[in-house]
Design a protein with these regions (language model features):
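N-terminal cap/lid segment of alpha/beta-hydrolase-fold proteins
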Residues: 1-24
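The serine-hydrolase catalytic nucleophile loop
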Residues: 35-48, 62, 244-245
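Short beta-strand/loop motif that positions the catalytic acidic residue
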Residues: 227, 233-235
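Alpha/beta-hydrolase fold nucleophile elbow
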Residues: 97-109
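Conserved alpha/beta-hydrolase
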Residues: 49-69
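Alpha/beta-hydrolase-fold enzymes
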Residues: 116-196
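Catalytic active-site module of serine/aspartate enzymes centered on a nucleophile-bearing elbow/loop
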Residues: 263-291
Length: 291
């Protein structure tokens, strides 16, 4: 593994690069993870496997998280994540050991909605694969949070952002909690997965409240309508918001090459279950090679 860094908007992003070639050029993959992710979580599991298959694989912390710079910390800003991912693609294309015509993007959970916009705005992404995607449209957001919850969170986020812009003060809540629903990612099952990372000091259980002003103003279905990069979707009825996944697939232009792998695998199994990750990685490898 090689520790790397690259700039975006006067901020340094820090990443881990797997599979660097000693000679020649290899295909490469920029990997983005779920909401509030840090690179050592699910993205690294996929990066190691992709490197074993001959890819240069980059995982990185988005701005405001992990080893990467940016203030305020724990600010979840999807549009900034779009720019971060585009910068990661550009970094890979600049490397001597990477074939610049074969740089693809792999996205996990809510990273998928970011990847759509990044791929739509950069028409040189070789191929896109999304795993257990959290696809963003208002219908899905209301299904996720309820109509009242969506409105309350957005209003709370907008008030917190106005406070930050006026005073520089950042209001924080937890990222996850076992019982408290006023957190960035509510739900006991989410807490069960993330809290052990926090207990080991490998993930910060913190969420800037003003994030919701940006997060809940973001959608990805308009980007799906512009997608030209070949797209592999791995999803299923036991993954998050399957209806939103179907709406995004339906929105993609008919001229865009697509493939759907739909099964009964539980959403969080794609984060840490070795056999599930092995199988998903093989699907991704075959897709990127054939695109």
């Amino acid at each position: 593994m090689e520790k790397v860094s690259f700039p975006v908007a006067n901020t340094q992003l820090v990443g881990d690069l797997y599979g660097a070639a000693e000679s020649g050029c290899r295909p490469a993959v920029a990997i983005i993870g779920p909401m509030t992710y840090q690179k050592e979580q699910a993205p690294t599991e996929y990066a190691k496997r992709l490197a074993d298959q001959g890819f240069v694989a980059l995982v990185y912390d988005s701005r405001y998280r992990g080893e990467s710079g940016g203030e305020p910390r724990a600010w979840e800003n999807p549009m900034h994540k779009v720019d971060d991912l585009k910068a990661a693609v550009a970094y890979l294309k600049s490397r001597d050991d990477v074939d610049p015509t074969r740089v693809s993007v792999l996205a996990i959970c809510q990273g998928s909605s970011v990847a759509f916009r990044a791929a739509a705005e950069r028409d040189d992404v070789h191929a896109l694969a999304t795993i257990a995607g959290h696809y963003r449209d208002q219908e899905g957001d209301i299904e996720w949070l309820t109509e009242a919850g969506y409105a309350a969170r957005k209003a709370q986020g907008e008030a917190a952002k106005a406070k930050f812009e006026a005073t520089g003060t950042v209001d924080y809540i937890k990222g996850v909690d076992q019982t408290d629903m006023n957190v960035g990612m509510p739900g006991d099952f989410v807490w069960e997965w993330y809290q052990p990372w926090a207990d080991r000091g490998l993930w910060e259980n913190q969420y800037a409240v003003m994030s919701d002003a940006d997060l809940l103003s973001y959608e990805s279905i308009s980007a799906a309508k512009q997608l030209t990069s070949p797209w592999l979707m791995i999803h299923g009825d036991n993954c998050f918001l399957p209806g939103a996944a179907r709406r995004h697939m339906d929105a993609v232009p008919a001229s865009t090459k697509t493939k759907t792998v739909w099964d009964e695998t539980p959403h969080l199994a794609y984060y840490d279950q070795a056999e599930v990750i092995d199988n998903a990685t093989q699907q991704v490898v075959e897709w990127f090679r054939s695109a």
